[in-house]
Amino acid sequence: MEIVIQEVDRINRLVKKMMDLTRPALNDFKPTNIHQVLEEILILEKGTLEMKEGAFVQVYDPSIPTIKANKDELKQVFLNLVKNAVEASPKGGRVRISTQYNTDYIFRKKQDTLSPHNIVVKITDSGLGITNATMKKLFTPFFTTKKRGTGLGMAVSLKIVENHHGKIKVTSEENIGTVIQVFLPVNK
């Protein structure tokens, strides 16, 4: 029950932030344990996945340090991503959540600004995958493939991750599933 109350408070804070999108973001970054953030989200989504006779598989890297982040904003990102993975999963499907500590970003390009020290949160589902046409519009505000979707989840998630100086990478194969990786810098 305490987590539900915390989530209502968090949503209220996020709504207040979204009401004035023209104001520059005030980054309320504090030391944050990413595993704690993920566990709170999984508690919220566990029932939905269990109704589909599915389960979460968690593989956490114990060496991950705390990061400087806005915990409420990261909860919103991972709630969006985990909820999408749960919705995409077939009956009896598994949603895998893994974390890893990287000391070098192996996909680095010259124009890439990601810190060489980062954590990666990987969310993998076994759904139908994302079509190429949908992939091109994935982060476009108000684009949705859901009947009741607003089309804001992925756009807001990307904006939050970028405000944390991170990146989101999405790979998907039709009829196999989708992998979403969120890279967040570790401030050394």
Where are the predicted features?
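Detector for a conserved hydrophobic position within an alpha-helical segment of the HATPase_c
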Residues: 161-162
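Short conserved segments within the C-terminal catalytic ATPase subdomain
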Residues: 48-58, 91-93
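Short helix N-cap motif at coil->helix boundaries in the Bergerat
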Residues: 34, 129-137
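Conserved micro-motifs of the catalytic ATP-binding
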Residues: 24-27, 66-69, 145
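A conserved beta-strand-to-alpha-helix junction within the catalytic ATP-binding
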Residues: 30-42, 98-101
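Conserved catalytic submotifs in the C-terminal HATPase_c
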Residues: 55-65, 100-102
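Short beta-strand/loop element within the Bergerat-fold HATPase_c
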Residues: 92-105
